[in-house]
Amino acid sequence: MTREGQFREELGYDRMPTLERGRQDAGRQDPGSYTPDSKPKDLQLSKRLPPCFSYKTWVFSVLMGSCLLVTSGFSLYLGNVFPSEMDYLRCAAGSCIPSAIVSFAVGRRNVSAIPNFQILFVSTFAVTTTCLIWFGCKLILNPSAININFNLILLLLLELLMAATVIISARSSEEPCKKKKGSISDGSNILDEVTFPARVLKSYSVVEVIAGVSAVLGGVIALNVEEAVSGPHLSVTFFWILVACFPSAIASHVTAECPSKCLVEVLIAISSLTSPLLFTASGYLSFSVMRVVEIFKDYPPAIKSYDVLLLLLLLLLLLQGGLNTGTAIQCVSFKVSARLQAASWDPQSCPQERPAGEVVRGPLKEFDKEKAWRAVVVQMAQ
């Protein structure tokens, strides 16, 4: 090609529309060079709806969470009005709180995560069934002491709600998400990156260990108080704390240090089992709130150290249960995001840092300085 023809080509290139220039450059590229095949529909810069969104599942999650919260609130109130007769109702109400939190979290983030919380739903259903058996045993031993009224209705309603949640989570599958996964991950993987929440889990584990040690020490102190000798509920509660807190804290720390598929699954299982137990214990000890409120009704208030200690232990239990529920939600969110984006992460090795001289190769093509400079010169000449 002569020099005159070359100039004509450059002038012709300059007169093209801006969008046509990019198309012509893309057509002139070498066959060995890599260009990302991106379409306007693949660019998901603003995601208003989560992937695999289903309105039916979202409505079910929000409705089930609302029903569980309302029923648990009424059950806690009625159980505190009759603290000694309806202790089973407080336990059942407390155990359903993690399921309500998880239902709202699933409806807000990703509805395809419902099957991953099946262990939590099953453990909550087991606790509510135990409370129903507890009610039956109390009714057999002393029929005249229990009024079968609103308490039985609330207990059966909690049982039915948890049974429906377990059935729906068992029947839910992630096949629709897997079918849609190709269209989601082909064009948007370069925009999003799945990262494991290691710092969050480490902070959770530290707080869990501190709160667990404080709760165990407080339990030992409370058991040595004269007023606590009459009831065995404190010893059972503190054994639950001792068993439930430390395995989840250790598993959180180990998983944050060296994340793998096996450890994430184990952490989800442990958190799903311990969270309903911790909230059950906190629901049982919720009568301490009414005792502390009654203390300040009289003036001057007759403060009892035993009631204040029970209230502090209740707050520690709520903190532990909230951290365990948050751990389960974080791990399930990471698991679902990694599965949707087809992220490959080695289940056997810990994350390693890149060498100092290694450069990360991106999918974008190299910038052609010579062609850009010639285009600028021609534009200025015109």
UniProtKB/Swiss-Prot annotation:
This is Membrane protein MLC1. Its main location: membrane. Residues 1-28 have a biased composition (Basic and acidic residues). It is a multi-pass membrane protein. The keyword Cell membrane applies. InterPro entries: Membrane_MLC1. It is found in: Membrane; Cell membrane; Cytoplasm, Perinuclear region; Endoplasmic reticulum. One of its GO terms (cellular component) is apical plasma membrane. It comes from Mus musculus. Interacts with ATP1B1. Part of a complex containing ATP1B1, TRPV4, AQP4 and HEPACAM. GO terms for molecular function: identical protein binding; protein-containing complex binding. GO terms for biological process: caveolin-mediated endocytosis; cellular response to cholesterol; positive regulation of intracellular transport; protein transport; regulation of response to osmotic stress. Residues 1-43 are annotated as: Disordered. Transmembrane protein mainly expressed in brain astrocytes that may play a role in transport across the blood-brain and brain-cerebrospinal fluid barriers. Regulates the response of astrocytes to hypo-osmosis by promoting calcium influx. May function as regulatory protein of membrane protein complexes such as ion channels. The chain crosses the membrane at residues 58-78, 88-107, 117-137, 148-168, 205-225, 234-254, 263-283, 309-329. It comes from the Eukaryota. Keywords: Cell membrane, Cytoplasm, Endoplasmic reticulum, Membrane, Phosphoprotein, Transmembrane, Transmembrane helix.
